[in-house]
Amino acid sequence: MGEIKTITAEQLQAKVEAEEVLNIIDVREDFEVANGMIPNAVHIPMNTIPEKLDVFDAKQTYYIVCAGGVRSENVCHYLTANGIQAVNMEGGMYSWNGEVK
């Protein structure tokens, strides 16, 4: 697998706090997102990504988030292989110190 783009939790938090328009996809399971998600993130569980490919726009960039950064990295590889621009948030929600909703 090729290299994928990454962003740190701190870098993504700065973008969120600057109110940038972002496409953040949280790929954790339902019970995990019940504890909170990054504001404006969209929840698409990892196992449903293949059937939801049509919701992704190849002209947009998507920031992919999970609990620790491993599942989101796998999703980034999958999306990239399907022509979608995906960026993995390193460390996942364990590294997120910003607001959650």
Question: Where are the language model's segments positioned?
Answer:
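Short, surface-exposed ligand- or partner-binding patches at beta-edge/loop junctions that are enriched
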Residues: V65
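Rhodanese-like catalytic fold shared by cysteine-dependent sulfurtransferases
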Residues: M1-L22, E29-T61, V70-K101
